Amino acid sequence: MINRSSGKDRDRSRSGDKELRINHKIKAREVRVIFDNGTQSVLPIEDAIKCARDAELDLVEISPNSVPPVCKIIDYGKYKFHQEKRQKEQKRNQKIIKLKEVRMQPKIDTHDLDFKYRNILGFLKEGNKVKVTIRFRGRELAHTHLGYGILESILERVGESNYVLESPAKMEGKTMFLIIAPKSKK
């Protein structure tokens, strides 16, 4: 079938998206045509369009950057449907990892630390990275060893079995932080 546009000219150079050129929108004089049976031949554009029209299909430019451009004789509507279906499938399988932050102070109580630890474990089980931040104020900066102790106790409780330390404890200005990430499931 020959694709007839409904008045909307979707020229790839203008729209910016990856819309493929079909039939008379292909600008090359010669194209490499791949037929249904897999054979290839280099043809003038008029002959290639005529072959596509005879087969009641479309001439679709697959690789415009090669010399000569590569075209296939296929049903464009069906091809576009399969491409969109494949993109949706890839998008569905894509895992988005967020960075969650848990803040605390160096003079945190044990019950509060337990509560923060449960939050950290929950975030890691959801598959998110966790940035554990300790903010120092005033004279607390003289006691950074307390912050390192808190971060070490969190790491011991989290354990190495399911999680990996992505960024070790660092001090930036008045804050100390580390980043824990879940191990990738491959």
UniProtKB/Swiss-Prot annotation:
Signal sequence region: none
Annotated InterPro entries: T_IF-3_C_sf, T_IF-3_N_sf, Translation_initiation_fac3_CS, Translation_initiation_fac_3, Translation_initiation_fac_3_C, Translation_initiation_fac_3_N
Cytoplasm listed as a keyword: yes
Keywords from the UniProt entry: Cytoplasm, Initiation factor, Protein biosynthesis
Family annotation (Pfam families): IF3_C, IF3_N
Superkingdom of origin: Bacteria
GO biological process, one term: ribosome disassembly
Region (Disordered): 1-21
PROSITE patterns with a match to the protein in the record: IF3
Keyword Transmembrane applies: no
Subcellular location: Cytoplasm
Gene Ontology CC terms, in alphabetical order: cytosol; membrane
An annotated Gene Ontology molecular function: ribosome binding
Subunit structure: Monomer.
Function, in words: IF-3 binds to the 30S ribosomal subunit and shifts the equilibrium between 70S ribosomes and their 50S and 30S subunits in favor of the free subunits, thus enhancing the availability of 30S subunits on which protein synthesis initiation begins.
Similarity remark: Belongs to the IF-3 family.
Stated name of the protein: Translation initiation factor IF-3
Native source species: Borrelia turicatae (strain 91E135)
